[in-house]
């Protein structure tokens, strides 16, 4: 008797079934590989591994992801002071936000809501709710507003290590006008760890982002939040988002302390001109405006000295320093390396907390 043929999705495959004791057996490798899965064998563990990738085409997957995530993205509108050529005046401001808690907490950009006197959140279904500002941190450009509504659909967060240049992403937000609420644009991750005049690193994307998209969601093809869309260069495909690792850091600080407890060294730092242009530099950070009671001054360092390392991690830009400081709290002790009079000296200092005015 000839071996039975095997079909996967209506197509015959090269693997034949085997009949033993009137029972039909089909080799899994051939079936799974024909279905687009990766099959591997671990000799040491004597186990088979099957990695099933998403079999949907882009034309099917993208609408599915948008449909899943869109209810978690909201529009934000409010009245407040706006600055223009003609001075300060009352106006209407708008942006986007992402639901992060079923009990009504919504994440957005700080610059979207910081000047709003009244805040209205408009859901995907068009329903509006008054909101209150709960947390804000302008250094990371993140804020949380809260509405009196429960049972909301929340966005899932991606893992930072899964954010890779070239991967496809979708931006969902409310560009330009509320008649375009929850618009979606598709693009790719263009770059990571971008420093573009902001205190912290950003994710770069070629996804179209415009006025009103700020505070919206940048998501991957698994429907997970990659970042909060924040800024871009007008008329280009060069746009940016606050990455999910910074989002997680800030939300954790909000939960623990009601604010982000930023670190202060009690001094201003000047980058090398190459670092200011985004060119790799090993010049360190020149100390300026050193306060007499600052941790660095207490360690006998002075203006004009150069900070080169913190806990043996080389520091060559302000963004690098700020990113490293996300691992510390005020009151922690760190070892700094400072070039003074042509010689690198090391000292343990206790970190201060940054004041609001710094």
Task: Report the location of each language-model feature.
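Primary recognition of N-terminal secretory signal peptides and signal-anchoring hydrophobic helices
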Residues: 1-55
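N-terminal activation segment of mature serine protease catalytic domains
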Residues: 53-86, 96, 118, 142, ...
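Conserved active-site neighborhood of the chymotrypsin/trypsin-like protease fold
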Residues: 56, 81, 101-179, 199-201, ...
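Short, flexible surface segments
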Residues: 70, 96, 102, 115, ...
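Terminal peptide-recognition signature
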Residues: 71-76, 97, 104-108, 131, ...
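PDZ/PDZ-like groove recognition
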Residues: 80-83, 89-92, 208, 255-324, ...
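Active-site loop architecture of trypsin-fold serine endopeptidases
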Residues: 82-86, 90-92, 116-119, 152-154, ...
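Short, acidic, Ser/Thr-enriched surface-loop or helix-capping motifs
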Residues: 94, 100-101, 123, 128, ...
